[in-house]
Each structure stands twice: as structure tokens, then as C-alpha cells.
Curated annotation (Swiss-Prot):
Record bears the keyword rRNA-binding: no
UniProt note: domains: The E7 terminal domain is an intrinsically disordered domain, whose flexibility and conformational transitions confer target adaptability to the oncoprotein. It allows adaptation to a variety of protein targets and exposes the PEST degradation sequence that regulates its turnover in the cell.
Protein source organism: Cottontail rabbit papillomavirus (strain Washington B)
GO cellular component labels: host cell cytoplasm; host cell nucleus
E7 terminal domain, as annotated region: 1-42
Lineage top rank: taxon: Viruses
Zinc finger (unnamed): 56-92
Name of this chain's protein: Protein E7
Record family assignment: Belongs to the papillomaviridae E7 protein family.
Subunit composition and interactions: Homodimer. Homooligomer. Interacts with host RB1; this interaction induces dissociation of RB1-E2F1 complex thereby disrupting RB1 activity. Interacts with host EP300; this interaction represses EP300 transcriptional activity. Interacts with protein E2; this interaction inhibits E7 oncogenic activity. Interacts with host TMEM173/STING; this interaction impairs the ability of TMEM173/STING to sense cytosolic DNA and promote the production of type I interferon (IFN-alpha and IFN-beta).
UniProt main location, coarse: host cell
Motif (LXCXE motif): 22-26
PTM remark: Highly phosphorylated.
Length: 94
């Protein structure tokens, strides 16, 4: 640069622009066994048994069962049983 104000013609680029790959070469499969075990442990600790009791669609007899799932799954089951999903007892199936 010559003078007090820079001029575009005086700028000299030292390097030319090159295309740069932004692709990440890491893979989730490369997790160590410890990381996978930690993830599985966290998942297992989130799952717990839930007792569910619902009336039979036909005879209104109570149907009870226990399922093991995480809190999100039991909320989904609750929404389904409250809306469109109905269960039928073994006697009414025949």
C-alpha cells in the first residue's frame, strides 16, 4: 500500500482461493465400547415398568397389563388409548 488510503489495485493476494471440502469424515460407528455402554445404560435407566388398565371395547371388563418403556412412549400409548386405540379382552375375541 502506498499512501494513506488503500486502493484496490494495490492489494496483492498471497494465496489463490481453493475449493474446500466441508464433508466430515467421522462416523458414529466409530464410538468406543465405553461410549456405547454409557448410551445403553442411560437408555435402560429411562425405561421402567408401567401398569396399564383399560376397559374392554365390547364388554367393559378391565384389561390390565404391564409394559416396559420410556416416559415418551407411555405418553404416546396414553394418547392412543384416549383417542383411537381400543383393546378387546380374550373372551370378546372369540
Amino acid at each position: 500500500m502506498i499512501g494513506r488510503t488503500p486502493k484496490l489495485s494495490e492489494l496483492v493476494l498471497g494465496e489463490t482461493a481453493e475449493a474446500l471440502s466441508l464433508h466430515c469424515d467421522e462416523a458414529l460407528e466409530n464410538l468406543s465400547d465405553d461410549d456405547e455402554e454409557d448410551h445403553q445404560d442411560r437408555q435402560v435407566h429411562r425405561e421402567r415398568p408401567y401398569a396399564v388398565s383399560v376397559p374392554c371395547k365390547r364388554c367393559r371388563q378391565t384389561i390390565s397389563f404391564v409394559c416396559v418403556c420410556d416416559p415418551e412412549a407411555i405418553r404416546t400409548l396414553n394418547r392412543l388409548l384416549s383417542a383411537s386405540l381400543s383393546l378387546v379382552c380374550p373372551e370378546c375375541c372369540n
